[in-house]
Amino acid sequence: MRRFVSRDSKKDFYLLYTLVFGVISFFIYYQFAGNGKSLVWSHDGIPQHLNSLAYYGRYLREVLHTIFVEHKLELPMWDMNIGYGSDILTTLHYYVIGDPLTLLSVFVPADKTEVLYEVLIFLRIYLAGISFSVFCFYHKNPKQATFMGTLIYIFAGWTIYAAMKHPYFSNPMIYLPLVLMGIDKIYKREKPWLFIWATAVSAMSNFYFFYMICIFMFIYAAFRYFGIFSERSVKDVLGWLVKFIGYYAVALMIAAVIFLPVIMTLFGTDRFQAENYVPLLYDKIYYEKYLGDLIGENMIQWGVAGYSAVAMAGVFVLFSRKKKYLDLKLGFGLLNLFLLVPFAGHVLNGFSYVSNRWIWAYGMMIAYIFVKAYPELFTLTVREKKKIFVMTVAYCVLALFAKAARTQRNMAGVLVLVLAVFTVTSFGNIFLQGKYMCGLLSALLVVSIMLNVSYQYSYEKDYLSEFAAEEESLDKLESNTDKAVLAAGDSGVYRYDQYGALPYDNTSMYMGTNSTAYYFSLANSSISDFFSEMYLNTPWEQHYENLDGRTILDRLASVKYFVISGDNFRYLSYGYNKEKGSAGKGKSECRAYENENALPLGYTYDSYIPESEYEKMDVVKKQQALMDGVVLEESTLPEASVDADNENIQYRMETGDGCALSKGAIRVTKEGAQLKLVFHGLTDSENYLIADNLDYDSLSPRELIGNSQWKKMSEYDQNKVLDEDSRWRYWKESKEAAMTVSSNDVTKTIKIFTDKYNAYSGRHDFLCNMGYSRSGVRTMTITFANTGVYTYDKLRVVSQPVQGIEEKTVKLGEEALENVKMGTNEITGDISVSEKKALVLSVPYSKGFTAYVDGKETKLQKANTMFMALELEPGSHEIRLTYCTPYLKAGMLLSVLGLVIYVMLVFRKKK
């Protein structure tokens, strides 16, 4: 300890830091391992995080193989195995590409990725501590204070909760201290290299957190300017602003090779453009629990504070000092204001849904407050100690005043806070030497961290149930669904669809198949637009599992196989008659059925439908129109005549208990209430339930009780309901709803997201395919999972005859692309057409594709909203498509230019 508290040696500091970090990290890891759990979150961790890391490792090894073995440089930019076919950079950037630490995956075999995944979780947290300590030492803070501040920073709610689910959520904790230190260096007229590179790496690492870093970068620079310079002028402010903008621009230019393609993709997503609900204030219970949650429970909207109670003692010490640390006091007030006002969470979350995922930055502030307050502990006056005592009493009373705030975790935090304040105010009386107080505060800090960890991973909290079992995560990606398709032994280029047979999304990416499932943060806007206009039964923009078994959509997407699990033959779509492969046993067995009339990757139309005419059509007519003509903005082909043979079926409604009807609305006051639609559907048809502009509003406990019933209740019972009502929005208000639709043993669910839901993308139109029926459907039963009011413009039952689909499919496939080969960033094939036609490729449209017909570049158009087409003259043709990530070349040029400017700056500084 004596060597540790000495002023000169930092080696001992990092040895002690590493030792304590290792002990606490082992304690965290043991909570998982001791319960047979891995650190892989089942929901997103398996299909996204772990899957992406394994993919990236293979990707890097393949690139190195082409360089050192094949002696050529090929960077794959497009992969048909990701969803319907996706850009690799823009899809995986959010998870792995750009993060320097994930480069380690190149050394780890795919089957050992889980080990690397878990190591990286703790390595990121460790580096965050190193980064914070470097920032503290730059500002000449003592090692004792820096040591404790570092532990406060890295072992808070954000890391023990959020970073375990999303490992890369620790990355901004590494970058922010370095960026802020870079700002300080510029103000001190030191070299700007740290600022430039910390900014560039954070921009390349993750666009989402980089946006937040930019906001805090600006706030910090403004605070530091007024804190450093006593003489100020508009000219001086503008001078510094120009300087910072210049260095910032250089950093962005360096990062542009990754940042530019990703940010341009982001701007095109529905999720980015959706208008989310932003309340003026949070609900009352949020404020009632706020103070206690800072050192205890997790708040809503990702406000996972959970800081050690020792940190709050540092806040009290800081505020007891008059006329000192004004910048930190104002910063503390500002960031607390951000947490208290929903609009701040809206802005800091990229003007999306309200979320406090920026709270890791609050953690740096509160940790640094403790670092600055620590030396003050030894010089506190009696008056200042009294102030600290009053603040402590006030805090404890307010933190535990509300019943909802008096949880075991919050009370434990308050107890540690009282002990910490007692320790702080006892110096000079009980503690006569600083080393003893340092030791006790450090012990309290570690105990506080351990308590927070223990509670977060307790059986009561049940947090660990969300994580996969040890060494099973990668096995789950080897799905029987993909194995059944591979067992068919088909070497062609095709897709498979499924219903209820896929345990996780994105398994095709791991198994090397082509599917209709996708689940990542960014999605191709052309796919999203198509699904929206087709009313595909999913509320997500970037998460889709299948095509709902819709025959026409399967045909147009070149789906050749349909997979079912167990004995779920009732979900097998029309036209899939022959079993071609299977995998697994019992209920987990999956069977792949072939459609012998499936369309290939490229098929042809002899006529087109102008986009302007297509947009006027009803959803069912749009679907049928796609079999008659290709939808293009303009074309020299003749216009198609659309043959619509669907029929809107008249029905009557039969309501069950807890379900009441009014014009355009269904009021549900009982979970599980049912509404029955009775009708006579067409024979030999697919049957759809279509909801136009479907929306949902939940009902509070008070709203569920009718006025007549309310008047009959006693005052006590009324008060009980009102008490529950006051807490309802925080705890139980549903931001989503589900309608289960059943017909002929087929059961499917329509999910509705409200504008309060974090994945809301603005979708309110749904078509639920209840499957093919030879004899005709007679009823559909809707079961409402949530109480509330379901509103709609139209609720329709439609029968879609399948008789003409086969004939139209055959026509589209008569003159098709043959000898299709998928190369690195390349698709090739041959085709012969007897007349002028449009060749449609069932590959998602992207500006990154360039088409060549017989070696000559040819205009490639967006077709059918989602796919691509090129017009062909009569005769035989060689088709070649090449791909380059949109804006990648511009990004590379900017990066080269940025590096050139950086080198020029270096030489200029040397001179």
Language-model segment annotations:
Residues E190, F209, Y325-F343, V347-K476, ...:
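Contiguous transmembrane helix-bundle modules in multi-pass membrane proteins
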Residues I82-Y84, T91-Y94, V446-A469, V485-L556, ...:
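Extracytoplasmic/lumenal acceptor-recognition loop(s) of multi-pass membrane glycoenzymes
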Residues R7-D8, E647-K911:
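Active-site-proximal, structured, solvent-exposed surfaces of multi-pass membrane proteins
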Residues I46-L60, L64-T66, P100, W240-G331, ...:
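Periplasmic/ER-lumenal interhelical loops and adjacent helix-loop junctions
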